[in-house]
Amino acid sequence: MLTLLINILQDIKEVSLEKIATALPIPILFESRRKKIQRFLSLPIFNMSALWFPIIKNWHSQTFSANQTIHLVIDRTIWERKNLIIISIIYEQRAIPVYFEFLSKLGSSNFTEQTSVISKVLPLFKNEQLLLLGDR
């Protein structure tokens, strides 16, 4: 199923559950295809530490030299009415997302939320010189 979804994403070039469900070549109703995709993507194996962290770790080891300072940015933003706190790596004047969490409240993040998010990312950069940037 994962290979099929990746092929569909490459073909339709959009990340929309409805568009993926429409393109999914399974002879069942549209709503059933949509629910099947939702259930599949909700499996516990699909989490940041199992899927995304190995990709970031591999990219980091290939991209940065051993004694290079890694610039991390912590930011809070609103995305489609969801309050997010994000940690990103700065690379070639771009912020590459490393980890994010949805906040259960509106408004700014507090120190506890920030340290919780940072603590999940730090193991990716063992023995690295880090510079953490944030506002306020």
What residue spans do the PLM features occupy?
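Conserved, well-structured functional cores that handle cations and Mg-NTP chemistry
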Residues: 1-136
